[in-house]
């Protein structure tokens, strides 16, 4: 989402968060095969796959469990592997297909189209073997709901990824998910509470505990150093990530999701009733805008002056979607993060119906169900929903939930100039390059089109 229109990690006065310009690169779409963010993303994906293949290898050889239980576990692992390849298809397009942990040969590249077919085939095969219940026992596991959600995402983006739209497939998978026992939680914030494992809207979460060595650390990334004094906990914040101003301004300020997503305004010292002061003596007021200090503008790799410059500590709307637990003491957060939830299913089905020009009444009903839950009434309902309405609603409902870049590509807005990104981006940057370090380890890899060949 740092490459989309939703998040930004601005450089602060004094150079904090410059970090070699990696965040400017992400915002301006100027990343390279040796960029840290590209390497980091590739590493997360490949290490995730290696872990899955390793555990699969152990369980496959095990004689200590019943055939039925082994089939379930192996199916869940195949689902997790397919999930990681779904992420790779989205972000990198082309990558090696590796499923055998004991095969030490250097794999060749597999095309995006073939990886797409692999993911669809794997998920289709394992669904009958996965559990379908929506319960405490199934929470956090790769269930039928999770598998169908990945399939729906594959079909939703099929036109972009393989050149063949499959809107009908989106509707079919969404309908199957809605037959399961998931619900649209009456209270939107239930999905983001400290103990949001009670939500029956969440389909596939990242599960966190405060004791995790590297758990949910959103508070560290986004909050100012003094924000915990106001929010009622302790910890060393990093004062990094903000919401992009133009994205914040797309929200209706009367929409509860506005305050439910962003921390904006003065931070009041609870002991004095006064606005806190930063170390530079400024009032700690989180503004929507990021005001670049004149004379601090940075140059790009070609030596051209950019609009990117240093901003003050207090500038920027902070992420406020996941509830900050009062009383936390230098720990990570307990809140799980939903990779998939039912609200997204409603919006995906609505989008597919509108794109097919079919059953606009049902599409409108689905979007209005999400809006009514947010506002608490039907006063803000649509009479006939459009694709633009759905695009905007996805932003309001799913902000910071890992969908914005994908949505922008699908709706044709990703490459356009926007905040801190003055130029149109070339088409090839819809996917990221294969990292140079990955090629150094495996010379069979081939660079994605548009990027410098290895």
Predicted regions mapped to residue ranges:
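Conserved, well-structured interaction surfaces
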Residues: 17-92, 106-114, 123-137, 317, ...
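C-terminal substrate/ligand-recognition segments
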Residues: 264, 268-368
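Acidic, glycine-rich segments characteristic of secretory precursors and extracytoplasmic regions
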Residues: 1-15, 39, 54, 97, ...
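An aromatic- and glycine-enriched ligand-binding surface/loop that stacks and positions planar moieties
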Residues: 1-21, 123-127, 141-297
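Short coil/turn linking the two alpha-helices of tandem helical-hairpin repeats
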Residues: 87-96, 134, 157-164, 355-358
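Long, intrinsically disordered, low-complexity segments
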Residues: 17, 45-48, 112, 118, ...
